[in-house]
Amino acid sequence: MTTVRIPAGWPATEEEARAVQDELRGRVILDEPGPPPGTGRVTGVDVAYDDERDVVVAAAVVLDAATLDVVAEATAVGEVSFPYVPGLLAFREIPTVLAALDALPCPPGLIVCDGYGVAHPRRFGLASHLGVLTGLPTIGVAKNPFTFSYEDPGAPRGSAAPLLAGADEVGRALRTQSGVKPVFVSVGHRVDLDHACAHTLALTPKYRIPETTRRADSLCRRALKEATA
């Protein structure tokens, strides 16, 4: 497991963090199709915290996009690098997530984040931030709609409805399993929204949550127990 320290110059205040978001947000690419769903590699990233010790563990799990078999995995443990502030959660996680990605023995391909991309109050959530820093195609698949509104999509798998900030579509509520509550998909970087939804459906053949996130969540929880034992 890779050990990470807070990088020199990392934002220490909300004002500094928002300035970084403002600087990087203009680099997000929204209109590329990204890799075809079900091809190449796709990587899930997730984190787990021990708040008493200020420890965060990140996991990156690479799957074969066609079979959803695990190809590679890596973890990293670090100090929590920013206070808990809604809208700025990426600053708590990104140094450790980047270290986990760097520790992989193969290129990650498309990255799927358990969270948000442009479906974010400042249109720059974790998936967008990670995509801009790495240059890799990224999407966000979240379990709840955050502060945004939506109409419930139809009951069948694959039904979708716009996730709205006022009149602007910032993502989609997507039904990944018939009769089960939707997930909330948004563009991160270099993958448009239609393809982000197609990737999400390809990653959810049996369960509501993408297989990438399920595997990364399980691994980071195990790694946190090991790191804090």
UniProtKB/Swiss-Prot annotation:
The keyword Nuclease applies. InterPro entries: Endonuclease-V. Its EC number is 3.1.21.7. GO terms for molecular function: deoxyribonuclease V activity; magnesium ion binding; RNA endonuclease activity, producing 5'-phosphomonoesters; single-stranded RNA binding. It is an enzyme of class 3 (hydrolase). Its main location: cytoplasm. Keywords: Cytoplasm, DNA damage, DNA repair, Endonuclease, Hydrolase, Magnesium, Metal-binding, Nuclease. Mg(2+) binds at residues 46, 114. Its cofactor is Mg(2+). The record marks 84 as: Interaction with target DNA. CDD domains: Endonuclease_V. It comes from the Bacteria. Belongs to the endonuclease V family. This is Endonuclease V. It comes from Streptomyces avermitilis (strain ATCC 31267 / DSM 46492 / JCM 5070 / NBRC 14893 / NCIMB 12804 / NRRL 8165 / MA-4680).
